[in-house]
Amino acid sequence: MGNLFGHKRWYEVRDKKDFKIKRKVKVKRNYDGNKYILNINENNNKEKIDNNKFIRKYINYKKNDNILKEFTRKFHAGNILFKLKGKEGIIRIENNDDFLETEEVVLYIEAYGKSEKLKALGITKKKIIDEAIRQGITKDDKKIEIKRQENEEEIEIDIRDEYTNKTLNDCSIILRIIENDELETKKSIYEIFKNINMSLYKIIEKIIENETEKVFENRYYEEHLREKLLKDDKIDVILTNFMEIREKIKSNLEILGFVKFYLNVGGDKKKSKNKKMLVEKILNINVDLTVEDIADFVIKELEFWNITKRIEKVKKVNNEFLEKRRNRTYIKSYVLLDKHEKFKIERENKKDKIVKFFVENIKNNSIKEKIEKILAEFKIDELIKKLEKELKKGNCDTEIFGIFKKHYKVNFDSKKFSKKSDEEKELYKIIYRYLKGRIEKILVNEQKVRLKKMEKIEIEKILNESILSEKILKRVKQYTLEHIMYLGKLRHNDIDMTTVNTDDFSRLHAKEELDLELITFFASTNMELNKIFSRENINNDENIDFFGGDREKNYVLDKKILNSKIKIIRDLDFIDNKNNITNNFIRKFTKIGTNERNRILHAISKERDLQGTQDDYNKVINIIQNLKISDEEVSKALNLDVVFKDKKNIITKINDIKISEENNNDIKYLPSFSKVLPEILNLYRNNPKNEPFDTIETEKIVLNALIYVNKELYKKLILEDDLEENESKNIFLQELKKTLGNIDEIDENIIENYYKNAQISASKGNNKAIKKYQKKVIECYIGYLRKNYEELFDFSDFKMNIQEIKKQIKDINDNKTYERITVKTSDKTIVINDDFEYIISIFALLNSNAVINKIRNRFFATSVWLNTSEYQNIIDILDEIMQLNTLRNECITENWNLNLEEFIQKMKEIEKDFDDFKIQTKKEIFNNYYEDIKNNILTEFKDDINGCDVLEKKLEKIVIFDDETKFEIDKKSNILQDEQRKLSNINKKDLKKKVDQYIKDKDQEIKSKILCRIIFNSDFLKKYKKEIDNLIEDMESENENKFQEIYYPKERKNELYIYKKNLFLNIGNPNFDKIYGLISNDIKMADAKFLFNIDGKNIRKNKISEIDAILKNLNDKLNGYSKEYKEKYIKKLKENDDFFAKNIQNKNYKSFEKDYNRVSEYKKIRDLVEFNYLNKIESYLIDINWKLAIQMARFERDMHYIVNGLRELGIIKLSGYNTGISRAYPKRNGSDGFYTTTAYYKFFDEESYKKFEKICYGFGIDLSENSEINKPENESIRNYISHFYIVRNPFADYSIAEQIDRVSNLLSYSTRYNNSTYASVFEVFKKDVNLDYDELKKKFKLIGNNDILERLMKPKKVSVLELESYNSDYIKNLIIELLTKIENTNDTL
């Protein structure tokens, strides 16, 4: 239940000797009895106390007005802000006379820089300064003699100057003699310190002591405290004092250190961030400081030190009996037992009876009449008048709750009420509690009025009787449904109702969230399989449900679709060489998939009856291993040889890092590489030695290589082995642990603990907690790279232009003996242990990285949530597959130098030869390519004429294969004696080695062609060329050839010269034309010439990095400051040219803004012509469908809970189960007994099902024949979303916005899902636009609301300057078009 004491962390307990001690504790509920546990943080001891004792202490804490006592205990005029000294014997400074005289504090000598030997002798600075004053030391003196003790010999101490470094064995110190002017300035500043401290202390003390005002008895005491502070004249005097200090600093910057010292924010002692921020503001003389800043400091500082709290108002009672009764009432009202604990205590509880009564009345539509009748008794009009009267008096705090309670006392205390049934009493209570919430709304609105966020409180609108009736009806329905679903959840998940507790529900909640995404993963894979297979003899695109009722129906490989996943399907033995579907697919794969899906939906926890064999698992493992791209292939694809030609030493250094899998545990708590990447790129971009490259393509080549190397380096540094021989080495993980722990000693669990604390903090509403943790890790990592791998980011020696790069790439590729520069990657062993890992691995092979990453992250989140390693193996498999997919897409670069026409022809030939994607064995390669291999062997041994004569005729008889992979050289068995003699000069081992090498070369060539076949396709290439040609040729005369330099430079016309990967990788998408249609016109209209004119080249080479650096530095400078402070700073930047020039190192804001706008225009055009938005749109479609599919899975799960809950209450009867069906509710199929055959649950009879259907309808769930979820395939919202039609065929007949509305409407039965559909979908866009979260909380529909999308989304603002992101307005309009586009068609989906 958390810490009831708010900021209070200390609690009084008894030690073993029964002495009262104070310990730092956390309070939590203990479920094995009616007790709370105090977790003592220091040593994890526990002490149990009973409820009443704990609650009594809590109530005393809330009632006890000890604020003044706490304030005076922790603060006095000597420490409230500046750390000042008091006279001897004065512990607390409360008056001006208590301060030590300024002359005794600010001395004309300063001492610092003590040597280590002097520290060891224990001679203090004070002793040295006192002796120096006594001896009259001047700046000309070089030594001073001091006795440690009276009877000891004098020690001679050298007086160094500040430019001389101390040594290990010297006995020295720096003594600085302060000049008179500086000394007087410091004394005057010290007097100001005293004035500020005394004024602050007296203001706060006065407010706390004020009995009349009683600030801390107000609900919003912070606001009242702020008002009181700002009204006090002394706060203006304090501000004036601060300005005096600033003026003195401005005239002499050496004074800054003196002020900092007395502000005392350094050191190891506890300091608030609030104080540190105020100190920064005080010392930053270029920024305005206001009285509001001072008031905010006081409020937050008192809160930080646990001084302020709201004091409970307690009516004074003279009668002892009444006082005891009142205290008992308090105790009862504060005992907040866990709701699951309540459920156990009252399991035979009357709530079941109440809920059954509500269900019957909801079903009969009589509940609304009952609510309206009770509401009429509550006399709302009278209450409104009483409340308005009280508000006119200025009372808008807990007093209005008193009016409310008094108004309804007659209803709840009367004998008439006590005679009502439990069901009626509960209905009264629900209404009462709802109205109490409306009173709370009045209080919230009053605060908004006071803060000028609202004009006035509209009580009549808040307490409108007709609106109240509708809202209370929803509340009653929700109350009823919650209990039904609560019971159903326990029953469905087979949880023991007598022992259930919060830990059970925490585990269950984690599992539920994983299950929802797994069901969505099944749906996504079903879509991918529908791209490969189609129904036999049916000429439409009707969906096949491979993991449901369709899995054994007739379907065939779709010959119309050329899909790279066919190779995977064939290697899994799901189709044979004639492309017929095998039993392995129907009887095994889909059966296992169906079983696993049903296990999830039916919450089956018993051990799996495994259907798959180790041979099945090995097929998947072999596919993953065969798809792996070697380090050499990666090097070739990413041109590491060219980019890191002069950096072999740094690559060797990276390869020499020894890794340990023991560090794997820390990986999951660290930021992903994508989070670190922007800062890594900044290391490259901000390196002053690096000059701009000649073309965008050159920079892309360098950056792609740099990103890959850094990705591998990041993994290696995390996994670096902490061996004994590495003790002297600066290992990153050790550095990070020291940084997080802020000490030299290493806490081995610090990373895990830091991460989990950030997660806990985020769950409590601190949205920045995780980002703050990630930032700290990233800063440490970037610092580590700067110290140890700076050379990696220095490309000052890289002088090649794009032509030279391509020539070198060709030369290296043509050189067969060239030893490539590679980054050695660890070769993980893939293991599949059961059917679940088998099915998920295949799903991952069939899906894109965008989908795999979602389910991978959910497995990871569940692992952390439940603190389990159960899913670690599947996470490793998914990571491996994503890595393969990423690297495979990079293999396009080697084809840059091919003529497009030639390349298309080449692909046609490859398609003929490698239509089945079959990987051949060594024996098959030798037999199939015998002539090629033989010719290579003859060339190798050409000097031996006699031997070559035999090899040409008899090589196939000399090479003897034992099996498909092993062979031997036999020069005797199958050839004549004379031939044996001729072969005598050819070494047997050499011949075997050469044959094996040429088989491997041929194998590599075959794999390369197959890989090329998988990635490229002649049809795709032709379409690619067509789209590029359309852009170049379809131009008006004034725009003619504006795309020439981007796509086909004149001197290399018709070549795949500048490869647009974004276009190519999307062109094979069945929906390419639809997606491209959204942006094609914008690309045509783009001013592409701007990218290559003088202005554009200057922007690319200079302005982009300059603007990015300015924005980053500004963000770093203002990081951690309050919003108000940032606004003041930015306002001054925009209005004051001198201030802007001084802080930003640019002319003025207007010139900066002009440069920013030009850079933005350049980036926008660049993104268009590079086809970047194709990926974004495709990603949007996947993400939207994924989010909506999760909502549909949520609905399906809830239906299971509702059926089980109604059965648990005895409202409906069931007669058994259909184990092969997943859905919870029946579907009409024309048969009389559909309610027993079409759902997982068999309803007892038709009457029982009709009752269930009517109850569901009462809650807002329509299961009728023509309802949303029971419509035909192309109309049912359930099928449309679950079958991923938004991705498969977007915009057809429906807009996406309409489908979002339909899903939201379907889930409207539960107020828990209020607007959750909209909120989850719009989260997809949050990286690209700013979302109005207040608008998202309101009720709305997307269809029929013309301006709702404009209100929900605003262009993204970047940096603290609040500049509009370069493409945010364009993306916002693109999103609106994406959501609202509709293509009316008569075709079926």
From Swiss-Prot:
Region of interest: Linker: 900-1170
Region of interest (HEPN-like fold 1-I), ranges: 499-636
Class of the enzyme per the UniProt entry, highest EC level: hydrolase
Any GO molecular function: endonuclease activity
Coiled coil: 893-920, 968-1046, 1101-1131
Uses described in the biotechnology field: Can be reprogrammed to target specific mRNAs in an E.coli system, which might be useful to create specific RNA-targeting tools.
Reported regulation of activity: RNase activity on target is decreased by EDTA. Target RNA acts as an activator for non-specific ssRNA degradation.
Region described as Helical-2: 637-828
Cofactor note: ssRNA target cleavage requires Mg(2+), weak target cleavage is seen with Mn(2+) and Ca(2+).
Region described as Helical-1: 348-498
Region (NTD): 1-347
Miscellaneous notes: Part of a type VI-A uridine-preferring CRISPR-Cas system.
NCBIfam families per record: cas13A_C2c2
Protein name in the entry: CRISPR-associated endoribonuclease Cas13a
Gene label: cas13a
